[in-house]
Amino acid sequence: MSQLPFWQQKTLAEMSDSEWESLCDGCGQCCLNKLIDEDTDEIYFTNVACDQLNLKTCQCRNYERRFELEEDCIKLTRENLVTFEWLPPTCAYRLIGEGHDLPKWHPLLAGSKSAMHGERISVRHIAVRESEVIDWQDHILNKPQWAR
């Protein structure tokens, strides 16, 4: 008899810190800057990545010090997850929180991030470094269909 993986046995609230961290597929979508219209609160998605994001691996170059180095860096937690309505439908935290399973390309199932990059889930193919951008408005993406 095979045992179910932890994400099928536990709620997000029941997961250990290491299980929680392992859910992140490392796509880098959280690390793309968003602009918020001050009048309407509408969120505009950009392809401008935080300078701490390694654009090839889509991993934070200074993960342990990210909040110290980037004051706007967000931390997804079990408590604040519901406030991040802009998370893509591919986000494991969102999927598990909504009662879905992980997609077949997720690194916990595929064994590596290659499938995720191959499916173009990661920002590797669109991201530009924040320090190289003059006008962020020139980098606004069409609003993704999944954005609420």
UniProtKB/Swiss-Prot annotation:
UniProt signal peptide: none
Pfam families assigned: CxxCxxCC
InterPro entries: Puta_zinc/iron-chelating_dom, UCP006173
Top-level division of the source organism's lineage: Bacteria
Family of this protein: Belongs to the UPF0260 family.
Name assigned to this protein: UPF0260 protein YE2365
Source organism (scientific name): Yersinia enterocolitica serotype O:8 / biotype 1B (strain NCTC 13174 / 8081)
